[in-house]
Structure formats: structure tokens, C-alpha cells
């Protein structure tokens, strides 16, 4: 992951803001990169407490454990019982597992500027840019795997 969707006014996400210089190296060195933008793309892979409870409770010991830990964390953080949360890290693994989970395209590698905006240089190498998460398909697969 890294940065936000290109339509956002900045690329200032949790990971990129930690070290813009590192993001510039990773995106500028020419290695194969898959960008899963946070806000505007991966943020769409959001689930609510109610959905998690409905689809996962009682399906397996692992799913019950994950729910208990996640619920305790979110209630401590959000200070309320009703919440929704993007499952950021699931999408990175999903991209590796099956192309049906998301849609991507080749784009020139963005330049992470120090003002937290993307720079554009059409001479740069291409990266894979994920622009859409197939939320329902990915959740269906995740729930089936966690129920085993």
C-alpha cells in the first residue's frame, strides 16, 4: 500500500507520511511495484461490526478469536459499539491470490513529493495501480476461508 487514490488531494497516508524519502526510493527505483492506494480504493474494503458478527461469529474457533480481539480493539479506540473499518492488509494478500478480487492497470510510477502531493513524470517506469476492489467477491472468499 502507499499513498491515496490519485483523485485525492494528497498522497499523505499513514505509511507514506512515515518516510516520504523511502516512498520516493521504492516508487522511483524501477522495481516492480503494485500500488494499493488507501483512501479512494482500499478504503472501500470496509466492514461494520454488525457484518462481521453476522458472517463470522460461530463459524470457527479462529473466526471467533479474531472477532473478539478486533471488537475489543475497536471499542477501545472508537469508544462506541457501532463502527466500520477498512481491512487494509487483506487487500495486499488478495491481490496476490486472485485477480478477480480487484481491478488494476499499468500507470507511470508517481513521484511522492515532499508537500504530500503526487508529482507526474511520464518518463518514469510503469507500476500496477489498483483502482477498484471487488468488495463483495473478496469478502465472500474471506468468510469462506475463515469458516474452515
In which residue ranges do the predicted regions lie?
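Histidine/acidic residue-rich metal-binding segments in metalloenzymes
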Residues: 28
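Conformational coupling and interaction surfaces
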Residues: 14-21, 25, 33-148
Amino acid at each position: 500500500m502507499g499513498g491515496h487514490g490519485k483523485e485525492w488531494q494528497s498522497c499523505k497516508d499513514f505509511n507514506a507520511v512515515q518516510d516520504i524519502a523511502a516512498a520516493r526510493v521504492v516508487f522511483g527505483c524501477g522495481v516492480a511495484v503494485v500500488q494499493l492506494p488507501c483512501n479512494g480504493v482500499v478504503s472501500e474494503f470496509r466492514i461494520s461490526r454488525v457484518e462481521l458478527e453476522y458472517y463470522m461469529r460461530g463459524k470457527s474457533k479462529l473466526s471467533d478469536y479474531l472477532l473478539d480481539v478486533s471488537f475489543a480493539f475497536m471499542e477501545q479506540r472508537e469508544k462506541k459499539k457501532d463502527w466500520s473499518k477498512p481491512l487494509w492488509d487483506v487487500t495486499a494478500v488478495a491481490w496476490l491470490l486472485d485477480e478477480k478480487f480487484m481491478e488494476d492497470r499499468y500507470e507511470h510510477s508517481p513521484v511522492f513529493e515532499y508537500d504530500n502531493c503526487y508529482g507526474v513524470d511520464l518518463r518514469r517506469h510503469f507500476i500496477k495501480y489498483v483502482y477498484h476492489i471487488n468488495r463483495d467477491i473478496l469478502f465472500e472468499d474471506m468468510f469462506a476461508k475463515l469458516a474452515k
